[in-house]
């Protein structure tokens, strides 16, 4: 269910900003980024992360996916750490939409809570995993929501490439699975089940063989959009680091202690060796 320290991708490296890297996106065909694409940013501060996860809480509570809590915030424990990157986009002065990307790490992935055997099977075959989760959108317009999702998935794909990962996994409601399959080439890797993290709502586990799919001549629309509009490694270099001192006294710390009995300061301290991102050559 968990990956060992020896399977980390960092090998004791420092953060992106302190390393000379070979940018994998230099190999990809380039085209101009569409001016109509909803803007996205990588969260660089505690305030931005908590604002994003407050939106997740608001939307998930409204949909009946989670119980209310006094911190008015929602986070999966596996998403808190230096292996994570919180992506968000603005809607006026507020966070309008968000998703969280988290690499496989010693705590495992959120989907391990229901698909540990299947994920362990992928790990044994050499897959290096990135989970996409905690998606939320403030807007009610379906067309605008799809545009934001395309934009955020572009960030997810390039985060996976820059961190030398092979697969992206995601758990979605059955009615959303076809979108990811048709627009990105995701495939089911295990049967649907109920998901305790969202009040036992149904979940379909999907897997994108990232590098295999990108090597094909013809790509699904979403994957082609990400390929043709690359992001540099520097886009992630100042992401919020989830250092113990940054989390101390935060809403994140309070929520994780109250809900899961986890002290993120202590957990983050034990994971300091995983600070860096291993970039592909």
Whereabouts are the PLM-identified features?
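Short acidic N-proximal helix/loop "leader" segments that mark the beginning
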Residues: 1-35, 251-279
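Short, His- and charge-rich active-site/binding loops that engage polyanionic ligands
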Residues: 88-122
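Short amphipathic alpha-helix that is part of the acyltransferase structural core
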Residues: 26-78, 86-88, 95
């Amino acid at each position: 269910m968990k990956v060992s320290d020896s399977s980390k991708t960092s090998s004791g490296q420092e953060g992106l900003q302190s390393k000379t890297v070979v940018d994998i996106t230099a190999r990809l065909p380039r085209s101009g980024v569409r001016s109509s694409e909803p803007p996205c940013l990588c969260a660089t501060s505690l305030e931005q992360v908590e604002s994003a996860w407050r939106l997740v809480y608001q939307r998930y509570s409204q949909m009946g996916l989670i119980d209310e809590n006094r911190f008015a915030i929602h986070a999966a424990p596996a998403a808190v750490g230096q292996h994570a990157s919180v992506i968000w986009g603005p809607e006026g002065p507020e966070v309008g939409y968000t998703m969280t990307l988290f690499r496989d790490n010693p705590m495992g992935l959120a989907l391990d809570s229901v698909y540990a055997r299947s994920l362990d099977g992928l790990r044994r075959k050499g897959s290096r995993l990135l989970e996409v989760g905690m998606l939320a959108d403030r807007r009610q317009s379906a067309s605008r929501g799809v545009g934001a999702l395309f934009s955020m998935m572009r960030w997810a794909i390039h985060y996976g490439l820059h961190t030398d990962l092979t697969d992206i996994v995601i758990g979605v409601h059955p009615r959303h699975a076809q979108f990811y399959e048709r627009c990105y080439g995701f495939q089911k890797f295990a049967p649907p089940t109920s998901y305790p993290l969202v009040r036992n709502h149904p979940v379909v586990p999907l897997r994108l063989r990232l590098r295999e799919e990108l090597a094909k001549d013809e790509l699904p629309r979403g994957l082609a959009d990400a390929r043709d509009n690359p992001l540099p490694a520097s886009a992630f270099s100042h992401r919020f680091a989830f250092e113990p001192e940054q989390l101390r006294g935060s809403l994140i710390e309070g929520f994780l202690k109250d809900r899961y009995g986890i002290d993120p300061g202590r957990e983050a301290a034990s994971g300091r060796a995983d600070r860096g991102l291993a970039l592909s050559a």
